[in-house]
Design a protein with these regions (language model features):
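Short acidic/His/Gly/Ser-rich catalytic and metal-binding motifs that mark active-site loops
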Residues: 13-18, 62-64
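Short beta-strand segments at enzyme active-site cores
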Residues: 50-57, 157
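Solvent-exposed loop/turn segments at secondary-structure junctions
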Residues: 12, 59-61, 161-163
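Short glycine/proline- and charge-enriched loop/turn segments
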Residues: 19-26, 69-77
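N-terminal nucleotide-binding beta1-loop-alpha1 segment
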Residues: 6-11
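Active-site-adjacent betaalpha module
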Residues: 1-4, 40-48, 65, 72-207
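A basic- and aromatic-enriched beta-loop-alpha substructure that forms the phosphate/nucleotide-
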Residues: 56-70
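A short alpha/beta connector and helix-capping loop motif
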Residues: 19-45, 49-51
Length: 207
């Protein structure tokens, strides 16, 4: 099988205290740890030559693409949260993202819906996905379910994910694991699988 790492929405707007999502009262418990572990996974994948695909949840100016199901009744729109081209919408610096990276922008929870993610992965010959990111029980779970329904083998890197509360994170992980949508693992597990003994050295390198 050929694998790829899919990093879901690890953006300033979700993961930084001054981001738009925390500012409307939906901050993520354990975001800092999740970002750190996602960085470990990204470094391991890059070192192993495994494709890394980043997704970004964002909206165009004017937000015509946001649709009627607004975050918190429009609070996010009210502060221009996750607006394309802003700091809020960008991938956090810790992951070493650059414009040259494979990046899929989306405006719905499921990263496969109305995006180029599936043809991109098919074009890379990928049939195994390692998934991490935020929010565990929302965009990550929606994407994992969609991947499963498209016949990808999915591994969830649970310690590189975060949700609004630990309970919601744990519930999302439990559903994905117990329903068979994903095998549950950690960022360190990914490093070991891809790099063997070199995984420890990669994990120790600063982002």
């Amino acid at each position: 099988m050929t694998g790829a790492l899919v990093v879901v929405d690890v953006q300033n707007g979700f993961c930084r205290p001054e981001g738009s999502v925390p500012r409307i009262g939906m901050g993520l418990a354990g975001a800092e740890a999740a970002v750190g572990n996602a960085a470990v996974a990204v470094r391991a994948a890059r070192e192993a030559g495994t494709p890394v695909v980043f997704t970004r949840h964002l909206y165009r100016p004017g937000r015509a693409d946001e649709g009627p199901n607004l975050y918190r009744g429009g609070e996010l729109a009210g502060i221009d949260g996750l607006l394309a081209g802003t700091w809020d919408a960008e991938v956090v610096d810790d992951l070493g993202w650059t414009p040259a990276d494979l990046t899929v922008d989306k405006c719905r929870f499921d990263a496969f819906l109305w995006t180029s993610l599936d043809p991109l992965l098919r074009g890379l010959g990928v049939d195994q996905l390692y998934v991490c990111g935020v929010v565990t029980n929302i965009c990550v779970e929606s994407t994992v379910r969609a991947a499963y329904m498209r016949d990808y083998r999915v591994t969830l890197l649970a310690d590189a994910c975060a949700a609004q509360t630990p309970r919601l994170h744990e519930a999302g992980v439990e559903v994905m694991g117990e329903c068979g949508f994903a095998t549950i693992a950690s960022a360190a597990d990914l490093g070991s699988a891809l790099l063997g003994d070199r995984a420890v050295d990669v994990a120790a390198v600063p982002a």
